[in-house]
A protein has these predicted regions:
Chain B
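Helix N-cap at the start of a conserved alpha-helix in ABC-type nucleotide-binding domains
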Residues: 164-166
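Conserved ABC ATPase "signature" region
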Residues: 97, 101-124
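Catalytic Walker B motif of ABC-type/P-loop ATPase nucleotide-binding domains
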Residues: 153-157
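Helix-to-loop junction immediately C-terminal to a conserved catalytic motif
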Residues: 51
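Conserved ABC transporter NBD signature motif
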Residues: 59-73, 211-213
């Protein structure tokens, strides 16, 4: 039954991607200054929005774990964060490719890019930290505390272009057909995120079931 | 009457392994409970939960009806664990006044000096702990644990590896404490010393409470009796 | 008020213990002076004024790490941490006491480093002295709070030595960047302008948020 939902969502995502790619590649015109390259924005921007959304959820569930002690919040925290890190990497890579083509540089140390890189390092650190603790309860507790600290960087990434002058472009107004494409692609990515989270959650639940059975076996 | 120390259906897991299972235990005020068991039976784990260092995986513990982590409760509990819990870089006197301050002891300098006298360390009050012999460190640890006049004492294998002088000091201090109606829970392998002090006995075997009751005459005359009767085969 | 009394008791205890053993503080001073000397040797004088802010805070961060990493780990021998957790001492008081002690030790290292910098780089750095001192305190507090907190977070981990640097530096980066920018500007003798005030507000905000978070979470992290 759980599998069915994943397959349905998967099919929906596939359809959406086909539709979106068609629109992005064929329907939309070349942008005035950037030519064809700007089309990567339709993946770059929603990837970061998705990652930000996922990390906010992870921050909240980490707080909920510390408040209630229920292991399901820990399972959600790790699943959501892992998927978020994947989207962070997509966001970084697409951004760097765009920058190389448009500005001629792979990287610059402006506020947005620096805080974004810190974000990747922090949540990567979260995953490494989890790997380093064997006891499930300690792991949940320590990583939840770390997740909350890491989350402080997320608003910094978001507001960095408002607070400082950055190389990274400022928010701009877009013609409606571009907004539409952007939002449709975001929908596809959100559904993809949900699929990955569900799969990871299921894996985490199975792991806990196995742990529970092992405990039972030891207790007998 | 509120139990001095109580455990209600306590479970504790280390990873997969259940270190404690279904522990239901109540210790009356003024009694002395000897907690027995082989190594790995769960004695230290249970004491750590009573002391508030760990939280039970399932179930709860209470000290005088309140949570073990409560600040007021912590003020009334004295702990003597495996480590001596005093600072090597500080002097004996500095260590005791430090803990005196943390526990809010009135007139902590005098109390510290009195305790140094009692454990026979007055003459080295300004010596740094790192210079002390093992026996001296252990006696300082005893002073630290009892300094704030606790009503509940949790002692994890307190007689292990003590020299004769330290054992004598500890026995005197514990008897005085019992005379003042303190409650003591101590885990031990030293059955003879334990049986002399204990009013009640509990035996842990593989995380379960195998026996809990008053100390009987048989236990006093043959300390190994309990293990033979209720321990693992 | 018992809270503050206990906080200062812990701070005094840490300072006394550190000043007697001098393990971390000696390493910290030596590291700081060595790096400053080496960089003075390696780079042309004119270039070093430009990089002064960055250089000084890299030195402070790494010299500081030598002190901060030991913060809670120093309680492990003799099981002293257990005694502190068992005492009627709020974990936040324990944390704050240690953070204050660390702050004082680090400020001592900085107080020596700045004049050394002035001498070996032939730099005039006292133009905006009081503002610079304020930035030094704010920046140092920021990364002290983080270092002390993460020392608590990792104290019971098997892989503490490996994990701590890995986790701590990314979190410190925003604070260090702000301090670097501000220090570089102030060493040049210029008062803070609007652009720099953004960094100043950022630094203050960083300090407030992480101090609050650390005080809130330290109890959860120490009791297993």
């Amino acid at each position: 039954m759980r599998n069915k939902l994943v397959y349905i969502l998967g099919a929906l995502v596939a359809v959406l991607f086909v539709r979106n790619l068609y629109v992005i590649l064929n329907v939309l015109p070349d942008e005035a200054n950037q030519g064809a390259m700007y089309r990567i924005m339709f993946f770059h921007i929603p990837s970061w929005w998705t990652a930000g959304l996922a990390l906010t959820v992870a921050g909240v569930t980490s707080g909920l774990y510390l408040a209630t002690g229920k292991m399901k919040y820990d399972a959600i925290s790790v699943s959501v964060t892992e998927v978020a890190v994947a989207f962070l990497c997509i966001g970084m890579t697409t951004g760097m490719i765009w920058a190389r083509i448009i500005w001629g540089i792979w990287w610059t140390w402006d506020a947005r890019l620096t805080s974004a890189l810190i974000c990747v390092l922090l949540y990567g650190g979260y995953l490494i930290l989890r790997n380093g603790i064997e006891d499930p309860t300690s792991r949940a507790r320590i990583s939840a505390a770390f997740n909350i600290f890491a989350f402080v960087d997320v608003p910094i990434v978001w507001y960095s272009i408002r607070w400082w002058r950055t190389q990274h472009p400022q928010p701009m107004s877009l013609p409606p057909e571009m907004w539409s494409a952007l939002l449709w692609n975001w929908l596809a990515l959100i559904l993809l995120m949900i699929i990955f989270i569900k799969m990871r959650l299921r894996q985490e639940e199975m792991r806990r079931e196995v742990d529970g059975l092992r405990r039972l076996a030891h207790a007998i | 009457m509120t139990h001095a120390v109580a455990a209600d259906d306590v479970w504790k897991y280390y990873g997969d392994y259940p270190a404690l299972r279904e522990i239901r235990l109540a210790v009356e005020p003024g009694s002395c409970l000897a907690l027995l068991g082989r190594n790995g039976a769960g004695k230290t784990t249970l004491l750590r939960i009573f002391a508030g260092f760990s939280k039970a995986g399932k179930g709860s513990v209470s000290i005088f009806g309140r949570d073990a982590r409560d600040l007021e409760t912590r003020r009334r509990v004295g702990i003597l664990g495996h480590g001596i819990s005093v600072y090597d870089e500080l002097s004996a006197f500095e260590n005791l006044t430090l803990f005196g301050r943390l526990y809010g002891v009135a007139d902590r300098r005098k109390t510290a000096l009195d305790w140094l006298e009692r454990v026979g360390l007055r003459h080295v009050r300004d010596g740094l702990v790192r210079e002390f012999s093992r026996g001296m460190r252990q006696r300082l640890a005893i002073a630290r644990a009892f300094l704030h006049d606790p009503q509940v004492l949790l002692l994890d294998e307190p007689f292990t590896a003590l020299d004769d002088r330290a054992i004598a000091v500890l026995q005197t201090v514990l008897r005085d404490a019992l005379a003042r109606q303190c409650t003591i829970v101590l885990s031990t392998h030293q059955l003879r010393e334990a049986m002399e002090l204990a009013t009640h006995v509990a035996l842990l075997a593989r995380g379960r409470l195998a026996y809990h009751g008053e100390r009987s005459a048989e236990m006093l005359s043959d300390p190994g009796w309990l293990y033979a009767r209720y321990g693992e085969s | 008020m018992a809270f503050w009394s206990q906080t200062f008791t812990i701070a005094a205890k840490d300072l006394r213990a550190e000043l007697r053993s001098k393990e971390a503080i000696n390493a910290s001073f030596s590291f700081s002076l060595t790096i400053l000397l080496l960089f003075s040797f390696a780079f042309v004088e004119e270039a070093t004024i430009d990089i002064a802010g960055g250089l000084l805070w890299i030195v402070f961060a790494f010299a500081g790490a030598l002190i901060l990493n030991r913060s809670f780990a120093r309680e492990l021998p003799n099981d002293c941490l257990d005694a502190l957790i068992a005492a009627p001492l709020p974990a936040s008081a324990l944390f704050l006491g240690k953070a204050l002690a660390n702050l004082l030790l680090l400020l001592a290292v900085e107080a020596v480093s700045f004049p050394v910098f002035g001498v070996f780089y032939n730099a005039r750095w006292t133009g905006q002295f009081w503002t610079l001192a304020l930035v030094a305190v704010l920046g140092t507090w920021g990364f002290t709070v983080i270092g002390t907190m993460f020392s608590a977070l990792t104290v019971n981990l098997r892989l503490r030595e490996v994990m701590l640097p890995l986790l701590v530096y990314p979190v410190m980066i925003p604070c260090l960047m702000a301090a670097m920018k501000l220090t570089g500007h102030l060493i040049g003798g210029e008062p803070l302008d609007a652009e720099m005030m953004v960094w100043m507000r950022f630094l203050i905000g960083f300090d407030v948020i992480f101090t609050a978070l650390a005080l809130a979470l330290v109890d959860v992290v120490l009791v297993s």
